[in-house]
């Protein structure tokens, strides 16, 4: 806007908001500064707004900062409003800035657009704004006058100085002139104010003037209440009041409409009050009592008094005149009774005839109906003083009706402090005279005394009222005729009873009163008989009880109405006493206990007394605040409340069997009459019972009542008939208050009953029935309607009245909807409430848009705050676009949001809520957040996009809030600062790259963001603001996310400097100490802190910060070992402190969080940590503390402690003696395992379906991970506990400690039982693998292996292991997932379980040998098919999984081959099959190793590549055109796969040949006589190299080919380091060492030669072989071996190593393998052996 920068003056509405404390300016110094700055405006009042002038017009036209269109519009507005031109332009600018409903961009076009300019005035928006400014100015003055003497008000001192200034500068005179000006102002016309001044505008102008007149008079009244008025001031006022007829003869009275009558009456009332206050009656009474009337100001102003007489003598024709005439007449009489003129006497008599007390009653009722503020209290005090003056100076008989006087007193004493003032006065003066009068007529006239005492009850006087009525000394009754049992005095002034008299005709035994014999009574005769006042002492409370009993007796008679009228004041008094002082409730039990019977009896009469019943219900509601359970129980027996005929079922929606009770019949009568006093009382009663937190059983009884409200009242109350204005709004407020109370009940403990509780009932009804739509309709009232109601309410304060009631109702609807959405159970279906909330309407006509537009509401900041809070909730849970719902108003609403966010005086809570809403929108509302981010995009020369912040971007505001150098930043408001940082965190968390890019480029962004991390925080206390902890937590998370997202090199220099500074200034140490101190504080308080949320946020962020720091130590400069040790020590200490606290879920949760980061630090910083002994000692204590807690609550924590112990054991190898408390630690782990395994087995048996076994798949090749159950997790307690047990077992090298534990606890039987169950049903995969790993470690020692064998390990796993795999028809599955897509070979799988079991059998057999042989043979017998299938599958399925299983299988067979005789005896056929399959396996491995291309072909097929169908082992590949060329990464992956497979094949081949040696004759024995029948011929007598794709019988050619392959591989490794195999096998990062590979190749070669020689000798010595074949064999062997010897000799001459298993090979000339490299090649044992054999066959 053109001149927006010129706006420096605060608007009157803003000033009023500041004074009310609804802004961010809450400090007294700020208020003083505002009052000093704008005090002159307050002093001027409405005169601040000047009329148009020529000079002002010239200044506007000369202002170059104003556009011509804005000047023109300002001048037109000046004429229309009759306002100074400069002020009109300023008013227009502020309106466009603060109240205009369009976008700020469109503001510039408003002055140029004729239609929009006219709309500003024709639609009265501009006029309303101007009128509101004028009213706000007067409200500021009123507010200051109301509270400048209130010591409890926070700004009373500042207000007092302002009032002092205004009093010195003659506030009264200025405001009196303004009032005169308003009274005499002519109505505007179209000639004077332009064509826009229509009749409607004139009417609105007149209403505004009436309101201003009333407010000016109210200000003058309050001013006179504080400062004395001079007689001349009063004379001037009186003349002015007479001129305008106390509001009845206004200048423009022809414009008065019926709707304006309350304002006209208000003007008259304040005129009267000003007159009474200006007389200073209190001073007059004080002077009269001391006979110093000459000290009164009017005593010396005789001329003024005469003029006043002449002015007032003509009055008397209007009700307003009564108090004025009587007060003046009494003043004249009090000042000089002897000189009272007839004129004055006439004034007094005229005043009495005007029914002044009825007038005063109406006046106080009218003032209190709209609002009940300080003005009303001051008016009551003024009238109280007047009544006291009147009663002191006039005889009561002169006053008309005693009842009118009591009614006035009833209204007077409604003001606070006045009852106390009355009780502190003399009982014979003032209103004490009235009290004595009504006491004298009691109980003949029952109502006056009760009404007066009802008004006199206050917190400090309730007991006085009770005591006064408890000791009544007289009893007045009326007789038409003189009774016979009376003795009378001669003059009939005294009577004496001759017989006692029972006062109430009640039955025997009932409460009653009895006047005893001889009682004296004073007689006052009247025209109707005798009025006797007996001198009889009694308790009025007993009399009240008798009156209620009488009512119960006459319920069914015609006297019931009359008796109800007598009893109703009693009930009202009891209600007031109980609600004021609950301690008296017990004393009133005889009365309150009879109210239940009254309700029961009176609800059934023909015409129930509705007001009386309403009072009864109100009384019970007050009583229920003290004893809700008793009231509920007693009330339930009456049948008054709705009830369920049958027990409440679990069907919430059903109302079957519900009865409306006695209230239901009354409710129908009220609907027909249009009066709802009982319904309001019923709602108050039920609300009180709900808030009373009844027990769950009693709360169930309230379900019918709540159902009645939700089904009958809430959906329909707005359609009922109403006789009185405002009752509908009051009903809606009460209904919503009840629902709000229910939704805010503290959660009850879960019970087994299926009946619904009150909360679930409300939630279900609101989400699924018409009740929810009714709440939506209330929220849909809209800001325009609400603002209109607020403008039209008659009250002056703006903080009370009908508009406030509507506003509170809408706020309740917001809160209820928010709570319903928050508390409703999760469901996939959309409820009717959610559908109605989120449905789109045309032209923005939907609830979302209505909610968003509440941002335009300016009166109460809590209303838009609650609306935004509901928007936030809907944005979180509702599947809709807020942006789409806003439609074309979206940009304007955004500008309104940001305007309030930018405003430096805006309420802080609104700003916080706006930021929280935007924080949620980042994740859930992409369109809306883009609107608020308002990023402008520019295309750069490089073709990329460059972002910048738009003028109306929320980031502009957020950057300003976090700027520590900006005076308007949020650093003085921690909660606002936290919200701003939380919004930035949401941007990073949702990875809004465009916004992040812009923010990174902003200067000092990272410095401003991270400033809190470099400050020194005070240690938190109960009273400190802890949002700074959350702020720091969000900052840490933003840094972590930035490092995570950005490549290390792309981090901004600014952030790099910050991180370096963070390290250099030792902030790691500082924050570690701070977090550690917080943790210790929580531990010391056992989790009973009030700030756990903030602590948890900071702890979570610190945990993330450390995790990122461990992975990016160089970026975050966390490389100092001492700092690392310090951080880990604090984490470990904090974890220990928290987890050792017993019975605290909070400490357990926080400790579990710390335990996670401790595990990571243990794994990442192993080399920098201190000795593991100290760490293990602390972890052992932590484990003991955790094990003492409820085990169902600490399952995850136990798992994390186990993981930490595992990591600590991995720091360095340790023996059992070096581990602190090793025996106890082992015992704790085993005991925990025992409990967890039992639970796991039970859980498995319950959860697993019966048909699980049928779903098992062929597991030879598939990585079937099974269905991981909830309790069987990789990081579960059982699995980690077993891994920890494995680590502890490895430390016990001798096995002694574990032997003791195994003897003490049944660990092994329990584990075996669980393993058997899991294997049998093929569940708990991770658990099975962990058990087998533990057992494998335990089997390393002889004691452990023996214990396992003794516990029956074979019986446990042998047969159940069959369930793990299932053979296919062809023995192997051909479907295999791609190798590159498969998990690591070490990942849990059922084939892996089988492999581990085979390895375990191998280990046990190796350790126990003959002691385990029988079990081993049993295992082989059971699984022989699988074993044979595995050996044969290598040729067809050369995958890592298959090769790994073959490796384990051959290893087991290698151990078993040491017992060939026993094996042959038990399983003769199997040993033959194994021999055959081993030979074929040898041939398959050799073929695959020989043809690398064929092996690559297999791997590529498994990786999904298309191969040529004509490929041969030696042919060239002719692949189809691939979709993309192979990359360096894919080639490297293929090379690694090839390396792994080749290494596996070599290991299998070595073990296979070693196993076959057991089935061939020993070379040392075969030369001697030997039974050849026990050794089968393993290889065929053929020397042809077998083809891979042919099913060729293994032969000598196979062994020779194997030797050739090994020689070839050895040669390649030595010659070509750049060869693929050499590169792969020679990689420094490879797990396979080059030297070990060579040794393995030599081992294979040795075994080949051994088998070759042994089998050849076996052929030579076999008589069944033809000599010709033997001769051919010799020739072939001689030739082949000679060739191989020459190649072998060349290899050894180059320095090749000898086989590490050379000692295993028997040689004719035994040589040590250790000298292989230093002796000539001829001395190699291998070469010597082969040479000897060649010489032998050549002979």
Swiss-Prot record:
Presence of keyword Glycosyltransferase: no
Any single GO CC term annotated in Swiss-Prot or TrEMBL for this entry: nuclear pore
Broad class of where this protein is predominantly found: nucleus
Bias type Basic and acidic residues, positions: 1254-1269
Entry-linked InterPro entries: ARM-type_fold (IPR016024), Nucleoporin_Nup188_N (IPR018864), Nup188 (IPR044840), Nup188_N-subdom_III (IPR048883)
Compositional bias of kind Polar residues: 1506-1528
Single GO MF descriptor: structural constituent of nuclear pore
Disrupted-gene phenotype: Morpholino knockdown of the protein causes abnormal heart and gut looping.
One GO BP annotation of this record: mRNA transport
Matches recorded under Pfam families: Nup188_N (PF10487), Nup188_N-subdom_III (PF21093), Nup188_SH3-like (PF21094)
Location in the cell: Nucleus, Nuclear pore complex
Classification via SUPFAM superfamilies: ARM repeat
Keyword entries, A-Z: mRNA transport, Nuclear pore complex, Nucleus, Protein transport, Translocation, Transport
Region span, Disordered: 1249-1269, 1506-1530, 1696-1717
Domain of life: Eukaryota
Role summary: Component of the nuclear pore complex (NPC), a complex required for the trafficking across the nuclear envelope. Required for proper protein transport into the nucleus.
Similarity remark: Belongs to the Nup188 family.
The protein's assembly and partners: Part of the nuclear pore complex (NPC).
Protein's UniProt name: Nucleoporin NUP188
Organism listed in the record: Xenopus tropicalis (Western clawed frog)
């Amino acid at each position: 806007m053109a001149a927006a920068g010129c706006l420096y003056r605060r608007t009157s509405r803003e000033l009023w908001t500041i004074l009310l404390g609804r802004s961010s300016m809450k400090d007294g110094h700020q208020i003083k500064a505002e009052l000093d700055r704008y005090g002159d405006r307050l002093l001027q009042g409405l005169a601040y707004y000047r009329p148009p002038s020529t000079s002002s017009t010239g200044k506007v036209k000369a202002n170059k900062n104003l556009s011509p269109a804005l000047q023109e519009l300002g001048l037109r507005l000046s004429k229309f409003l009759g306002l100074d031109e400069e002020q009109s332009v300023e008013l227009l600018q502020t309106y466009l800035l603060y109240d205009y409903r369009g976008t700020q961009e469109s503001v510039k076009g408003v002055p140029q657009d004729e239609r929009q300019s006219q709309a500003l005035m024709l639609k009265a928006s501009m006029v309303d704004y101007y009128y509101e400014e004028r009213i706000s100015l007067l409200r500021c003055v009123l507010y200051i006058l109301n509270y400048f003497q209130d010591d409890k008000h926070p700004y009373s001192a500042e207000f007092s100085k302002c009032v002092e200034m205004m009093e010195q500068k003659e506030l009264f005179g200025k405001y009196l002139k303004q009032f005169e000006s308003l009274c005499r102002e002519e109505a505007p016309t179209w000639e004077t104010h332009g064509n826009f001044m229509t009749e409607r505008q004139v009417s609105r102008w007149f209403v505004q003037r009436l309101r201003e007149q009333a407010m000016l008079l109210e200000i003058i009244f309050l001013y006179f209440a504080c400062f004395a008025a001079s007689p001349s001031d009063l004379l001037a006022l009186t003349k002015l009041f007479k001129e305008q007829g106390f509001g009845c003869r206004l200048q423009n009275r022809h414009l008065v409409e019926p709707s304006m009558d309350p304002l006209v009456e208000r003007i008259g009332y304040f005129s009267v009050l000003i007159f009474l206050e200006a007389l200073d009656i209190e001073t007059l009474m004080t002077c009269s009592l001391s006979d110093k009337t000459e000290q009164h100001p009017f005593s010396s102003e005789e001329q003024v008094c005469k003029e006043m007489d002449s002015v007032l003598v003509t009055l008397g024709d209007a009700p307003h005149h009564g108090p004025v005439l009587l007060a003046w007449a009494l003043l004249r009489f009090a000042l000089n009774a002897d000189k009272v003129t007839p004129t004055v006497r006439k004034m007094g008599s005229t005043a009495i005839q005007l029914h002044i007390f009825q007038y005063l009653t109406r006046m106080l009722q009218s003032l209190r109906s709209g609002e009940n503020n300080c003005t009303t209290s001051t008016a009551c005090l003024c009238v109280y003083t007047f009544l006291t003056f009147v009663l002191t100076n006039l005889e009561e008989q002169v006053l008309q009706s005693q009842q009118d006087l009591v009614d006035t007193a009833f209204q007077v004493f409604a003001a606070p402090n006045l009852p106390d003032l009355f009780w502190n006065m003399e009982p014979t003066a003032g209103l004490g005279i009235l009290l004595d009068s009504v006491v004298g007529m009691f109980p003949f006239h029952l109502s006056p005394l009760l009404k007066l005492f009802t008004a006199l009850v206050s917190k400090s006087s309730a007991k006085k009222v009770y005591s006064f009525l408890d000791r009544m000394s007289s009893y007045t009754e009326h007789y038409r005729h003189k009774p016979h049992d009376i003795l009378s005095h001669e003059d009939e002034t005294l009577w004496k009873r001759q017989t006692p008299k029972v006062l109430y005709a009640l039955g025997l035994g009932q409460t009653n009163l009895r006047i005893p014999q001889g009682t004296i009574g004073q007689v006052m005769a009247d025209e109707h008989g005798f009025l006797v006042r007996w001198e009889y002492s009694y308790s009025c409370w007993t009399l009240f009880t008798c009156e209620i009993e009488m009512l119960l007796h006459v319920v069914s008679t015609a006297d019931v109405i009359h008796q109800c009228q007598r009893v109703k004041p009693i009930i009202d008094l009891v209600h007031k006493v109980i609600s004021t002082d609950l301690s008296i409730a017990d004393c009133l039990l005889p009365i309150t206990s009879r109210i239940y019977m009254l309700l029961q009896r009176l609800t059934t009469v023909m015409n129930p007394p509705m007001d009386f019943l309403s009072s009864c219900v109100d009384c019970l509601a007050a009583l229920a605040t003290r004893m809700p359970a008793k009231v509920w129980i007693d009330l339930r027996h009456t049948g008054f409340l709705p009830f369920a005929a049958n027990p409440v079922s679990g069907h919430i929606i059903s109302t079957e069997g519900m009865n409306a009770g006695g209230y239901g019949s009354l409710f129908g009568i009220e609907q027909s009459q249009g009066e709802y006093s009982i319904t309001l009382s019923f709602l108050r009663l039920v609300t009180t019972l709900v808030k009373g937190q009844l027990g769950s059983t009693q709360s169930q009884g309230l379900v019918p009542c709540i159902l009645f409200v939700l089904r009958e009242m809430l959906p329909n109350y707005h359609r009922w008939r109403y006789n009185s204005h405002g009752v509908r709004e009051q009903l809606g407020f009460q209904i919503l208050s009840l629902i709000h109370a229910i939704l805010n009940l503290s959660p009850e403990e879960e019970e087994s009953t299926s009946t619904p509780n009150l909360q679930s009932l409300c939630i279900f009804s609101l989400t699924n029935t018409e009740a929810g739509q009714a709440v939506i309709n209330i929220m849909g009232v809209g800001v325009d309607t609400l603002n209109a109601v607020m403008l039209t309410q008659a009250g002056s304060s703006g903080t009370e009245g009908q508009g406030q009631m509507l506003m509170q109702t809408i706020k309740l609807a917001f809160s209820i909807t928010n709570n319903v959405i928050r508390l409703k159970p999760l469901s996939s279906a959309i409820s009717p409430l959610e559908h109605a909330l989120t449905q789109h309407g045309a032209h923005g006509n939907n609830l979302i848009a209505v909610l968003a537009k509440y941002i335009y509401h300016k009166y109460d900041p809590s209303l838009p705050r609650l609306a935004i809070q509901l928007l936030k909730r809907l944005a979180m849970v509702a599947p809709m676009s807020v942006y789409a719902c806003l439609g074309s108003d979206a940009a304007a609403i955004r500008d309104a949001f940001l305007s309030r966010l930018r405003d430096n005086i805006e309420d802080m809570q609104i700003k916080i809520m706006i930021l929280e809403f935007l924080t949620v929108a980042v994740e859930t509302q992409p369109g809306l957040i883009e609107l608020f981010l308002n990023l402008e995009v520019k295309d750069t020369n490089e073709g990329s996009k460059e972002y910048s912040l738009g003028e109306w971007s929320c980031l502009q505001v957020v950057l300003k809030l976090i700027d520590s150098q900006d005076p308007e930043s949020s650093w003085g408001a921690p909660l606002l600062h936290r919200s701003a940082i939380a919004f930035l965190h949401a941007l990073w968390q949702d990875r809004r790259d465009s916004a992040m890019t812009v923010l990174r480029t902003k200067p000092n962004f990272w410095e401003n963001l991270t400033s809190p991390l470099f400050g020194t925080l005070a240690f938190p206390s109960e009273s400190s603001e802890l949002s700074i902890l959350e702020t720091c937590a969000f900052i840490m998370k933003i840094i972590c996310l930035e490092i995570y997202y950005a490549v290390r090199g792309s981090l901004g220099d600014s952030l790099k400097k910050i991180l370096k500074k963070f390290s250099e200034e030792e902030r790691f140490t500082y924050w570690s100490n701070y977090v550690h101190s917080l943790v210790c504080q929580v531990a010391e308080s056992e989790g009973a802190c009030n700030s756990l949320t903030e602590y948890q946020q900071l702890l979570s962020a610190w945990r993330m910060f450390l995790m990122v720091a461990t992975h990016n130590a160089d970026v975050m400069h966390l490389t100092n070992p001492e700092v690392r040790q310090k951080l880990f020590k604090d984490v470990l200490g904090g974890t220990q402190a928290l987890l050792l606290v017993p019975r605290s879920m909070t400490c357990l949760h926080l400790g579990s969080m710390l335990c996670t980061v401790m595990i990571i630090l243990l794994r990442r910083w192993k080399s920098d940590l201190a000795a593991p002994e100290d760490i293990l000692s602390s972890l052992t204590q932590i484990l003991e503390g955790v094990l003492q807690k409820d085990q169902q609550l600490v399952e995850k924590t136990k798992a994390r402690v186990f993981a930490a112990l595992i990591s600590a054991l991995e720091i360095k190898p340790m023996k059992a003696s070096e581990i602190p408390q090793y025996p106890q630690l082992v015992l704790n782990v085993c005991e925990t395992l025992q409990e967890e395994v039992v639970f796991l087995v039970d859980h498995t048996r319950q959860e697993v379906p019966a048909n699980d076994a049928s779903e098992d798949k062929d597991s030879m090749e598939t990585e079937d991970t099974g269905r991981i159950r909830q309790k069987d997790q990789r990081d579960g307690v059982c699995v980690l506990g077993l891994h920890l047990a494995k680590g502890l077992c490895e430390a016990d090298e001798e096995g002694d400690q574990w032997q003791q534990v195994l003897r003490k606890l049944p660990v092994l039987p329990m584990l075996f039982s669980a393993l058997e169950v899991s294997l049998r049903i093929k569940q708990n995969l991770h658990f099975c693998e962990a058990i087998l790993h533990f057992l494998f470690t335990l089997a390393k020692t002889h004691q452990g292996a023996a214990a396992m064998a003794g516990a029956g390990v074979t019986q446990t796993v042998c047969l159940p292991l069959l369930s793990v795999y299932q053979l296919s028809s062809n023995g192997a599955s051909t479907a295999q997932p791609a190798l590159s897509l498969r998990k690591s070979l070490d990942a849990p799988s059922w084939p892996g379980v089988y492999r581990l079991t085979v390895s375990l059998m191998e280990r046990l057999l190796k350790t126990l040998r003959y002691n385990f042989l029988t079990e081993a043979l049993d295992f082989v017998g059971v699984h022989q098919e699988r074993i044979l299938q595995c050996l044969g599958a290598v040729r067809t399925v050369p995958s890592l999984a298959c090769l790994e299983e073959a490796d384990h299988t051959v290893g087991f067979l290698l151990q078993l081959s040491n017992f060939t005789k026993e094996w042959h005896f038990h399983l003769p056929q199997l040993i033959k099959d194994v021999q055959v399959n081993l030979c074929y396996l040898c041939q398959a491995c050799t073929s695959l190793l020989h043809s690398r291309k064929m092996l690559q072909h297999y791997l590529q097929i498994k990786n999904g590549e298309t191969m040529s169908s004509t490929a041969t082992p030696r042919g060239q590949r002719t692949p189809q055109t691939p979709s993309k060329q192979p990359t360096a990464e894919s080639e490297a992956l293929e090379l690694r796969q090839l390396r792994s497979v080749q290494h596996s094949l070599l290991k299998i081949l070595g073990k296979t040949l070693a196993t076959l040696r057991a089935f061939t004759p020993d070379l040392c024995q075969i030369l001697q006589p030997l039974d050849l029948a026990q050794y089968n011929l393993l290889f065929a007598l053929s020397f042809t190299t077998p083809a891979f794709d042919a099913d060729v019988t293994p032969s000598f050619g196979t062994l020779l080919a194997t030797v050739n392959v090994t020689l070839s591989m050895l040669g390649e490794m030595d010659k070509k380091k750049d060869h693929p195999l050499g590169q792969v096998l020679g990689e420094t990062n490879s797990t396979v060492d080059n030297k070990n590979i060579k040794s393995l190749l030599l081992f294979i070669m040795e075994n080949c030669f051994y088998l070759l020689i042994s089998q050849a000798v076996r052929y030579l010595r076999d008589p069944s072989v033809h000599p010709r074949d033997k001769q051919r064999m010799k020739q072939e062997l001689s030739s082949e071996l000679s060739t191989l010897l020459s190649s072998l000799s060349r290899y050894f001459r180059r320095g090749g190593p000898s086989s590490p298993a050379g000692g295993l090979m028997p040689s004719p000339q035994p040589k040590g393998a250790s000298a292989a490299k230093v002796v000539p090649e001829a001395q190699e044992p291998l070469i010597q052996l082969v040479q000897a054999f060649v010489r032998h066959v050549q002979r």
